[in-house]
A protein has these predicted regions:
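Contiguous mid-protein beta-loop-alpha structural module that forms a pocket-lining wall or clamp
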Residues: 161, 165-257
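Alpha-helical scaffolding within the catalytic cores
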Residues: 44-53, 89, 116-130, 152-161, ...
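Structural recognition of the beta-strand scaffold that forms the well-ordered cores
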Residues: 63-67, 72, 105-110, 135-141, ...
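N-terminal secretory targeting modules
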Residues: 1-67, 72-79, 90, 94-103, ...
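Solvent-exposed loop/turn segments at secondary-structure junctions
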Residues: 70-73, 111-116, 142-148, 177-181, ...
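Oxyanion-hole/transition-state-stabilizing segment in secreted/luminal serine hydrolases
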Residues: 65-67, 72-73, 99, 116-152
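Post-signal peptide N-terminal segment of secreted/secretory-pathway proteins
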Residues: 89, 95, 103-105, 136-141, ...
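Soluble non-cytosolic domains of exported or imported proteins
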Residues: 62, 78-83, 113-117, 121, ...
Length: 411
């Protein structure tokens, strides 16, 4: 009897321990599951996700992508591969794929400090060409975007790109948390318009911190990047969403809306490369004839995400020859580099002219730079027209550097 009671006592102890600590924050499991459930703000239409899961279970090739900023790239934990996106990839393979899950492929297209606008320029190359046309994609820019109309339009363009290339692509909208908030208020109407499943971390994290469910240090490493436990929480929320979609009664397939949620649209962005093969684009590089080897790097490769670019030659004898581009477009995005503070090469200001009119001056050497990307929409029209764009160093910066990281346009 004593042995039986001892065994029973050990069993009860283990059950209680599992209830208290089977989650990253070591809190009551029921409370944790309620937190997870609260992050699911909309299940959207489940038809696309059900098809993806059916393909995974059948052993068919399935391509998963994640597009976002530093949280998606894996910032926070000691190892970036402990980020939520990598955890999600491992979890969905383990739960739904046969065998070792080798039929499921993953491409993490996260890049620190970047938002939806640059995402439109990166999408075709960094998501599709580096990986493949996704069957499932997570889009996460809620703590990087500033919430203005341009970011809302860019977010919609990314959703549209994924669905147009593959109408059966399951797009998941993920809104990360930060101590300064997020832009889920601007993104949720777009996601609702496309019937997307959505997870919002912010309200639940804020509520949990307010009620001392866990400490700030348990979730955040700083003001935005989660701890490994925070990333695990995000993964659990995404997996709970997938499980809910899997178990629910099948919805009728959702058609891609004929119109757009917000116009003018930024959909259909084409990236321009220095080895330009686009007959619509004519470029004279002027003094921007060098290649910058210090542009932003990807954690997954430790190499530049923009190895091809246009760097202004630092030369006291430079004649300040402008970068000149002629093209037909509706929208044009210019991305320049914020030179790392303290770098021996000093960067300066460049003026941007469109059809002879100065539209902006950008400072590539402003304080706080870390070789980061600075995207700006410099042409924004409803109808395509022919334009001439000039970029040249501003007075006083003729001897300094400036890097055009990349360009993107729509027709």
């Amino acid at each position: 009897m004593k042995i039986k009671n001892a065994i029973l006592g050990v069993g009860l102890f283990l059950m209680c321990a599992a209830t208290l600590s089977a989650n990253p924050f070591k809190i009551n499991e029921n409370d944790y599951q309620q937190m997870v459930e609260k992050t699911i703000v909309n299940t959207g239409n489940n038809a696309r996700m059900k098809k993806v899961l059916a393909k995974i279970r059948a052993g068919e090739k399935v391509y998963i992508a994640a597009l976002g900023g530093s949280v998606t790239e894996g910032a926070g934990p000691a190892k970036f591969t402990d980020g939520y996106a990598y955890q999600f990839f491992r979890a969905i393979k383990a739960k739904y794929a046969p065998g070792d899950g080798k039929n499921v492929y993953f491409n993490n297209a996260g890049l620190s400090g970047t938002g939806s606008l640059l995402g439109t320029v990166r999408y075709q190359h960094d998501v599709v060409e580096v990986g493949n046309t996704p069957d499932l994609i997570i889009i996460e820019f809620a703590v990087n975007d500033n919430g203005d109309g341009i970011c809302q339009r860019a977010f919609e363009a990314l959703v549209r790109e994924a669905l147009t290339a593959n109408p059966e692509c399951a797009v998941l909208a993920l809104y990360s948390a930060a101590t300064y908030g997020n832009t889920s208020v601007q993104k949720r109407p777009v996601a609702d318009f496309y019937s997307l499943p959505q997870v919002n971390m912010l309200d639940v994290v804020n509520e949990s911190l307010k009620n001392n469910v866990f400490k700030k240090e348990a979730y955040y490493t700083d003001i935005v990047h989660p701890t490994i436990e925070g990333h695990e929480f995000m993964c659990d929320c995404l997996m709970a969403l997938v499980d809910k979609l899997d178990k629910a009664k099948a919805d009728s397939p959702a058609a891609i809306p004929e119109g757009f949620f917000k116009e003018p649209v930024l959909y259909g962005m084409k990236r321009i490369f220095p080895d330009n093969k686009d007959s619509n684009v004519k470029i004279e590089v002027g003094d921007f004839k060098e290649t910058d080897r210090k542009c932003q790097t990807l954690k997954k490769t430790n190499t530049s995400d923009f190895p091809q670019n246009w760097k202004k030659k630092l030369d006291a004898k430079a004649e300040n020859l402008p970068f000149k581009m002629e093209l037909t477009c509706k929208n044009l995005i210019l991305v320049y580099k914020g030179q790392a503070s303290g770098d021996a090469e000093k960067f300066g200001k460049a003026e941007v002219y469109v059809d002879g009119r100065k539209v902006a001056t950008y400072d590539g050497g402003k304080e706080g730079g870390w070789n980061n990307c600075e995207p700006h929409l410099i042409i924004d029209e409803r109808k395509a027209a022919k334009h001439t764009v000039l970029i040249k160093m501003a007075p006083g910066s003729e001897k300094l550097g400036f890097t055009i990281v990349t360009l993107g346009y729509t027709l």
